[in-house]
Amino acid sequence: MHRRSTLFLEPSRRAGFILGFCLCPVLGTWAQTNAAPGQAPSNAPAPMHHHAQPEAGDCAGTDLKCATAVTPAFDAHNNLWVAWVAGGAVSVARSTDLGRTFTDATIIGRYGELIDVGADAKPQLAIDAQGRAVVAYGVFKDKAYDAQVWIARSASIWAKEGPGFGAPRSLSSDPASQRFPVLAFTSNGRLFAAWLDKRTVALARKQGRAQAGAALAYAWSDDAGATFSGETIAQDDTCECCRLALAFDARRQPVMVFRAIYDEHERDPAVIVLSSDGKPALQRRVAEDHWVIDGCPHHGPSVAVTADGALHAAWFTQGNARQGLFYARSENHGQNFSDPIPIGIAARQPGRPSLLASGNNLWLAWKEFDGTHIYIKERHSSDAGRHWTNERIVAETDHAADHPVLIAHDGAVFLSWTTRDQGYRLIQLEAT
């Protein structure tokens, strides 16, 4: 007999309470009705300023201090860029001192309550070696939580007049719902984007068939996001409300871990590898957790690839086989994974994993909550996940907090984290 979980979650608002943030009042409503909604960004060069500490309950504006979700990226000039959602707007800013100070924000677009601020709905930010940048995020289209993925592009974030992001436009040409984009540049400059897509679900409905979840869709760009081609459905039966995790292998092939739907009701982690011709080369179940759930977990996985070719996955589950946060590795490119290893203190609700590989060094960060404090913990492996250090606390707060994000630059590894009381922080991690 399967143990069945039931979650009664509204994908945007209620998920924010699980996230740990107060869901702040937002500014305005949909401001424009043309094909590229959103306020035109300010492209004037901006002065640097200190990132002020937010006051308790001060979360109504669009500033970084009010952010509910922050995504970092480094450029080739050693600048740190962050994209975030706050006050119903998507914004970006630059730091030249590892996050201690930031320029004034460039607002990509304002959407009011339509912006997707669900627990797994971080804005995406990718920057190539030439200083071209792309931001992607989701915006709801209706009360049924159908959404559209918007992208905004800068031809040069180093331009004297400012980063110059153009008007946002739809990533996909299909009118069906799309959510939870991920995007990244390969080492040779191609831009890969993937998202959860409802076009096959809509088609099944028209044909009188029921189809659970969403499809995993992807496309490529050879001009840094100016255009995308090869829009493809990789597979159906994907959990429609959990983020995708993306990495590239040594052959620059996309490796994604996501929550797949098995036997109509089980939602367990899966891996898919896309071959050089753009077609799925492999799809496997990472672990048989047998999480039977009538609802949306809003809790996506993480993935990394070490220099030895091993694939690494971390995920949260409440399955019949196991419950909590787990890690596993594959030495045969995803054909099989090791037995899942539990991560963190089970009584403290460990979750929200972030994996990062640098050579054969591997880091894993996650979030725990003891009823009063939120902790970010990490472990490190110097041999591609075969052996790990003991866990240690990197940061903590007793206020609302974003999920941890690990990022590497110039040989160093950092934890990117924002909290309501301490603001944005970039914390360097030392291999122990």
Regions found by a protein language model. Give the residues of each.
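Intrinsically disordered and other compositionally biased segments
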Residues: 10, 22, 37-38
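Hydrophobic alpha-helical segments, especially transmembrane helices
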Residues: 14-15, 154
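Extracellular, repeat-based ectodomains that mediate carbohydrate processing or recognition
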Residues: 34-432
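N-terminal acidic, proline/glycine-rich, low-complexity intrinsically disordered segments
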Residues: 2-3, 31-34
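N-terminal secretory signal peptides that target proteins for export/translocation
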Residues: 1-11
